[in-house]
Amino acid sequence: KYTDVQMLLQEPQLGTGHAVQIFQKKNKLDNNSKLIVLYGDNPLIDLHDLKNMNAQLAKKDIVIMGFKPKINTGYGIVVENKGKVSRIVEFKDASAILKKIKTCNSGIMAFSSKALKLITQIKNNNAKKEFYLTDIVKLSKKYNHKIKLINAKDVKTALGINDMYELGVAETIMQNQLRKKAMKGGVQMIAPETVFLSKDTTFGKNVKIEPYVVIASKVKIGNDVVIHSFSHIEGAVIKNKVSIGPYARIRPGTVLENNSKIGNFVETKNSIINKNSKINHLSYVGDTTIEEDVNVGAGTITCNYDGVKKNKTLIKKGSFIGSNSSLVAPVIVGKNSIIGAGSVITKDVPDNTLALTRAKQKKVKLNKKKK
């Protein structure tokens, strides 16, 4: 799937410099090569900063991305002498005086081909016996390499993640960014802080989202869509003038065509709900195609799994499914047909047909109980 990505295993893990050394052994770099080193625990990095670093490599040999947090919680310290970077000191190794320096090392660095040749000279002369990539700064001074320090556009973009709390902080920042982008693009959110989006979520015009909605990955939303409270959507295509929820679960493979409606406590999966069709209440629809102008009554279930495989249901145009019905797949309901309430349908229903499997109603007179 990611054919342009090369995966290398660092085993054992002997530091950031060691990781780059492994990369160098597997890849031949020419004199025009550039390398930007990023970290998996810096998810908020901004493309603007990376472009800036790349541009600086036209004049510099090493570019360091720094940032200035209000409180240094353990980041390496960038030491400068007369406006030039002289070294980077790990927080735990820094003196009390150095810890007063405001500029921290994000860990993100960019290298010219000239600087990359020094990677092999990094030693592990430290208490942890690790190869620190930051040691290349001190090495470069010996060769008069040009070093540039740039500060991140936003301090938040340089945040690293070391535990679940910091992951939660980063997720909050990311969600706020996604909400802002969506609302600036015209999406109305009643209580933005309760709406959760994915980075790949796309919106059309005039979309309204009520409180407590989760939109997971691979969701495309069209124009004039209303998503009511407590709905969860994942892997779905939502066309125009669609209403969802409240309390709806839209699972992967769902396509909601124009002017369709999914009501409260309805779950759909791998199904196409066509134009003007409605599933208003308390239903499960899986592996199903519902054609245009279909009404699915409350409590309808498509019984798609027989214990071995999933089977498909087709409900054709203009049909009406009565409440509390079970459609046992594979099954087809023909055009303009009616399924009587409370039916269990196990065989195909022809066009223009009423089908019902209700047991005959009996009346039994009750004897009065003695007091």
Set out the residue ranges of the language-model regions:
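Conserved beta-loop-beta/alpha segment of the NTase-like Rossmann-fold superfamily
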Residues: 2-82, 110, 114-120
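Conserved beta-strand segments of alpha/beta enzyme cores
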Residues: 4-6, 84, 146-148, 188
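Fold-independent oxyanion-binding glycine-rich loops
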Residues: 10-11, 38-41, 66-69, 81-82, ...
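A general structural motif
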Residues: 32, 59-60, 144, 291, ...
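Conserved ATP-binding module of the ATP-grasp superfamily
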Residues: 66, 176-186
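Catalytic-core segments of class I nucleotidyltransferases/pyrophosphorylases
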Residues: 85-175, 180
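Structural signal for interior beta-strand "rungs" in well-ordered beta-sheet cores
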Residues: 188-356, 361-362
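Adenosine-phosphate binding glycine-rich loop
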Residues: 365-371
